Each structure stands twice: as structure tokens, then as C-alpha cells.
A protein has these predicted regions:
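Conserved strand-loop elements at the edges of beta-sheets that form or border functional pockets
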Residues: 5, 15, 62, 96, ...
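Short strand-edge motifs at loop-to-beta-strand transitions and within beta-strands
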Residues: 9-11, 100-103
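Beta-strand-rich modules
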Residues: 13-35, 104-127, 131
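Beta-strand residues in well-ordered beta-sheet regions across diverse protein folds
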Residues: 14, 70-72, 83, 105
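Pro/Thr/Ser/Gly-rich low-complexity, intrinsically disordered linker/stalk tracts
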Residues: 18, 34-76, 109, 124-142
Length: 142
């Protein structure tokens, strides 16, 4: 069905399904002399599941005995999952927060600590829907 209209080159579907694929066709239009829209063809479609956008401005700063992570809020996120690893360690879950920052008090002073931050929200069924991460950051505890 109809999703929305915009004069811009992007559109955010706030009602996208998170448990199934959403299909989108974009139709260009011009206004006719009579004031009616003349709709063009849509040569292709795209599809995706509804998730939160990646966090932006992810940064790591060394602190005494810790590494402090900060980022800009992801639209519609209820919280953030923090994953990481040291140079020689295994990738895994570190913690979660509803804020736009996290302090890893178990960060290594000897090795680089690598961090990924994933935004999430809970759908109507209470299921956690996890978004993507755009990049990673790294730091060492002082």
C-alpha cells in the first residue's frame, strides 16, 4: 500500500515491519498544467527490515583504569549494546546502556580495546530489534 510522499531524495518509514521485509517502489511525478500529478514509472524496488540507524560520532577516550565511549543518539533507539575485544581476546558482549556513553572499567592498559556499539529498540511483542554498527573505535586504559 501507499507509504508516503516527499519532495526530498530520501524517506524514513516509521512504520516499517521489523519481523518481515518491507518492499519500496519510488515513483517520480510532475505537476500538470491542470494541477494533477503526472506519475512516472518505478524501474526497480528495494527492500529492508525495520531497524534503528547506526550510531554516529562514536569516540573512545582513555581514562585512568578505563576507556570512555561516547556517541550521538540513534533515532528511535531505546538503548545500546556494547561489544568489544582486545587485540588478543575474543569478540563478545561488554554491556548495555540507555545513555549515549559507556565506561569500560575492565579495559586493558596493555592492549588496544576495540568497541562496537549497536542501537536497539523493543517491538510490540517485546522482542529486541538490534540495528547495525557503522564503525568501531579503539582505546587503552591509562
Amino acid at each position: 500500500g501507499y507509504c508516503g510522499m516527499t519532495s526530498k531524495t530520501s524517506f524514513v518509514d516509521k512504520k516499517a515491519l521489523d519481523n518481515d521485509y518491507n518492499f519500496y517502489w519510488v515513483y517520480p511525478y510532475v505537476m500538470g498544467a491542470d494541477g494533477n500529478r503526472i506519475v512516472g514509472k518505478s524501474p526497480a524496488y528495494v527492500y529492508a527490515k525495520g531497524i534503528c540507524a547506526s550510531v554516529t560520532n562514536l569516540k573512545a577516550a582513555s581514562q585512568n583504569g578505563a576507556v570512555k565511549l561516547t556517541w550521538t543518539k540513534s533515532a528511535d533507539a531505546e538503548g545500546y549494546l556494547i561489544y568489544g575485544k582486545t587485540e588478543s581476546g575474543k569478540y563478545g558482549y561488554i554491556g548495555m546502556t540507555s545513555k549515549t556513553g559507556y565506561i569500560d572499567k575492565k579495559a586493558s592498559k596493555k592492549e588496544w580495546n576495540f568497541y562496537w556499539v549497536f542501537p536497539y529498540y523493543k517491538n510490540a511483542d517485546g522482542k529486541m530489534i538490534v540495528g547495525q554498527t557503522g564503525k568501531y573505535v579503539y582505546g587503552k586504559a591509562k
